[in-house]
Amino acid sequence: MLYDDTIAAIATPPGEGGIGIVRISGRDALKILERIFVPVRPGRWKPYQMRYGRVVDQNGAVVDEALAVFMRGPRSFTAEDTAEISVHGGPLVVERVLQQALAAGARAAAPGEFTMRAFLNGRIDLAQAEATLDIITARTTTALALAEAQLGGWLSQELHRIRDLLMDPLAYCTALVDFPEDEVDPQDIETPLTAAVQALDALVASAQHGIIYRQGARAALIGRPNAGKSSLLNALLRVDRAIVTPIPGTTRDTLEETASLGGVPVVLTDTAGIVESDDPVERLGVARSRQAVRLADLALLVVDVSLPVADDDREIVALTEEKRTILTLNKIDLIDADRSIIAARQREYEQIRGKAFDAMVTVSALTGQGLDELGATVARLLLGAPIAADGRLVTNARHRDALARAADHARDALTGFQQGVSPDLLAVDLTAAINAIGEVTGESVGEDLLHAIFSRFCIGK
């Protein structure tokens, strides 16, 4: 694929909206803009100034009123000459404007090609490019803050610092291969290597939280029919997503929606009440409920606190034996939050389970009481600790894996040096560590990987 031609794409989401934007980037961006856009006030284009006019077709017929701006490279997103045309947000209008740009000499952009050009032109590195996608797909304010911090360059700066720590020992090892008679202070190799290993280990450890914030987790709501699972789902989502009736068994299939709980995007699965049934549809729903529990990172055992334990509860509780589980005592509004009843229910269910639950929370899906505590408890069990104050977490599994390999190679080099391994073998590990870091920043990646990464972007980004 060429990267020195001019591309165009619709940069706004499909469908109707207030405006639609067509983006053009490449060496002929201004020429194409001048062919299809006629400003009301003629004159030379001044970069970064919005102009009002009309988009016209090849015959001069007006396509739509528009606002257009031209940005001179490298002071643009792609670091190339770029034009953006804003028109009315009807899908037909926006598509017609795009077709005029293509007819005037632009090529239809591939998914993520604008961001790829920003990377290839050195405006951002690969970690920052991937952060752009994370900003678009962020489902919680915490995930958004982490993505914005990565786009701001903290990870790139830290990796360049670590790379520099590895480069000096590599230079010493290379010199010792060529000039073995030279003497090197051991601290000149051991000190930066130790610092690099510690820094890489810290980044890898941060991914345990960061990936959850970015990708989310899964939680299954399980319990008897009419325990209030669907009502609780609706309350956590703050919308009426699941059908709720007083009739037990209303939910006969699993239903999934994503909620932000304690800053963590959690896919909540509302399951059918687990009971013995001769109804084939209900039995299928129960089977899917069991599957949902198996796939979940966490289970919420939803209990109607006003009712005593029943025989059906034993089978339900058994599903939680190998799963982190929150005993969620619902409908506390029916018992006026009577502590003696709450304690009795907790004791009864723990006796059935044979051990304590990972947490117990009292809630009322009807009044909203306890929902914030439930969300915080879910986040605590998933994360184990609150987010770092500076928000500097590795959030991408690809980055974590590459940095883990870098840490292993750097550690092997450090251990090898302490054990007197020859400099040429140390250089192999140091080079491998530096290359693994380059897989994150983009300094040592192939074209296939780049296409795999950028193909996940939408067209126009």
From Swiss-Prot:
Residue span, TrmE-type G domain: 216-383
Any one GO BP annotation for this protein: tRNA wobble uridine modification
Annotated positions binding (6S)-5-formyl-5,6,7,8-tetrahydrofolate: R23, E84, R123, K461
Positions contributing to GTP binding: 226-231, 245-251, 270-273
Keyword Oxidoreductase among record annotations: no
HAMAP family: GTPase_MnmE
Subunit description: Homodimer. Heterotetramer of two MnmE and two MnmG subunits.
Main function: Exhibits a very high intrinsic GTPase hydrolysis rate. Involved in the addition of a carboxymethylaminomethyl (cmnm) group at the wobble position (U34) of certain tRNAs, forming tRNA-cmnm(5)s(2)U34.
Annotated protein name in UniProt: tRNA modification GTPase MnmE
